[in-house]
Design a protein with these regions (language model features):
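Binding-site signature for planar aromatic cofactors or substrates
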Residues: 1-139
Length: 139
């Protein structure tokens, strides 16, 4: 995410996001809301506005990471900014590591995909190859 000016944010669509549904939603209705959380910080910032999708090579190239550019960049025209106090974050103990759920107590992504697709996708092989896929598609 980059601040372009007082009223514009730029959000790259990084490789691996694969959220084409978000892009379709923006084409149908450009209104957006963004919530910014910083680990360990209780306060949040909420921004509302409208978004447009840019595939301008000059803009996408300005977001290069490890030689790879995003496929598109959301150009968010900011209409309102809200500062949220820390009460909800503090009450939820969101950043308290002692309250975090143990990862092994939850189903893996492969298990969830296998369950949702009747075994057509996912499963142990999906989980086994996940680190390699992540490394290849993170940027």
């Amino acid at each position: 995410m980059r601040v372009a000016d007082d009223k514009t944010l730029l959000v790259p669509d990084r490789r691996g996001n694969n959220r084409i549904d978000t892009l379709r939603n923006i084409l149908a209705d450009p209104r957006v809301a963004l919530l910014f959380l910083i680990p360990g910080c209780g306060e949040t910032i909420r921004i509302t506005g409208s978004a447009a999708i840019s595939i301008d090579p000059k803009l996408t190239q300005s977001f290069l990471v490890e030689g790879k550019a995003p496929r598109s960049v959301l150009v968010v025209s900011v209409e309102a900014v809200f500062f949220q106090c820390a009460k909800a974050i503090v009450r939820s103990k969101l950043w308290d590591a002692s309250r975090h759920v143990e990862r092994k107590s939850l189903p893996s992504a492969g298990m969830i995909l296998a369950d949702l697709t009747g075994g057509e996708l996912g499963g142990p092989e999906h989980d086994r190859t996940a680190p390699e896929r992540l490394k290849a598609t993170i940027y």
